[in-house]
């Protein structure tokens, strides 16, 4: 089980990303638009830098919903390899069975 503080910190980051997503996208569009004057694009860059660091999507870490583990994460199932093996062997995940041949 991961530290509760790490899991909560990641949840706070997810909330910040949602809150600032529109503003961040608008500013990024201005910065990337080559047709706009350089001064306006520079102002947008400064305003983008003033946003909280944790409002950037790259700061979010994919974590297992069962254990909170950050590594060995399967995106489709939103869980780690260890939780997948445990729940799969117990038959609690539909369609997952232990392989035997």
Curated annotation (Swiss-Prot):
It holds the Pfam family Ribosomal_S14. One of its GO terms (biological process) is translation. Keywords: Ribonucleoprotein, Ribosomal protein, RNA-binding, rRNA-binding. GO terms for cellular component: cytoplasm; small ribosomal subunit. GO terms for molecular function: rRNA binding; structural constituent of ribosome. Gene3D superfamilies: 1.10.287.1480. NCBIfam families: PRK08881.1. Part of the 30S ribosomal subunit. Contacts proteins S3 and S10. Belongs to the universal ribosomal protein uS14 family. PANTHER family: 30S RIBOSOMAL PROTEIN S14, SMALL RIBOSOMAL SUBUNIT PROTEIN US14M. Binds 16S rRNA, required for the assembly of 30S particles and may also be responsible for determining the conformation of the 16S rRNA at the A site. This is Small ribosomal subunit protein uS14. It comes from Brucella anthropi (strain ATCC 49188 / DSM 6882 / CCUG 24695 / JCM 21032 / LMG 3331 / NBRC 15819 / NCTC 12168 / Alc 37) (Ochrobactrum anthropi).
